[in-house]
Structures are given as C-alpha cells and as structure tokens.
Amino acid sequence: LPVYHPAMIAGHIAMMDTLLDGRLIWGIGPGGLPSDIEAFGNQEIDRNKKMVEVFEQVMEIWWGEAPYNIKGEFNTITTKETLTPEIGQGIAPKPLTHPHPPVVITALTPHSHGITLAAERGWNPISCQYVQSHWVATHLPKYLEGLRNANKNEDPRGWRVAKCIFVADNEKLATN
C-alpha cells in the first residue's frame, strides 16, 4: 500500500470488487522487499505506519461523502475544488462488500508483530513462500495472539501460506 496513492487504490479495489460480484480478497502489505523499498524511495519512512494510514484513507474515501478533504502524515486527498457531482467527477466508487473486501496481509519476518496487529483489525495473514519454514512457523502463534487480544475466536483457518505451484495436463509434463 505505501507505494500507491489512496485515491487510486480506492477506485481500483472498488471496481475489482464490483466486477467480481463481491468475491474479491484484497491483499495488502508494506512493500517488504529491499528492491521495492529502494525503487519507490521508501527507505526513510515507517512503511507499516504509512500502510495503515493509506488503508484508513481508503476507508474514508469509500464511506465518506464528496468533496473529500482527508489529511494524513503521508497523503492529503481533496476534491473540494474539482467536484462536479452532476457528472460524477470527484466522487469515488464504493466497493460492493461492506465495509470493505476481506483483507489479507503479507507476513514475512519471524515473530512478526504486524501479524498480531493485523489479526486485531480483522485481517488475515498470508505467509510468504520464500521465507524459511522455521520463520513461517512463528506466524500462526502471532496470529492467534492478535485474535485473543481482540476477543475473537482463535480460529487458525484465517492464516494462509503462499506456495508456488505448477498445474499441467499430466504428470509427465508437470515433472519435466
């Protein structure tokens, strides 16, 4: 989320949720690869803090009324001077799913406090495929901790682990 503008995210996610008839699962993350961080100039900022701000600003866009006047530490969003309601200019689309599509957040580091915070917000973690398995093993307890902190049912089924797979027409093709 930190590498995109909240207004663009709000429009794109609302459109995708509508096109998918409310079946969208929205994947978010702070942009954790060192190459991403450098490429987008995010080396000196708190990416987790910016990710939360962007998410909250998207919510304000979706569930607020135009003209928007949303101020944050990292982004300011306004349509007060260009709002033209008769043609829909300056009014963001809203997703089909209320209050927002289900959210999954990337989990990368061992004993990630971000997983706990995500679970407290009702988001589900998805452990990255390219991290060491003993790091991935630390993610479920942190997820359950967040659910406990939020007085939610400690159901581990919200936790996901990403894996690369190849699907082929037959076993021979798949193993070559």
Predicted segments, located by residue:
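Active-site-adjacent structural elements that line small-molecule/cofactor binding pockets in enzymes
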Residues: 1-176
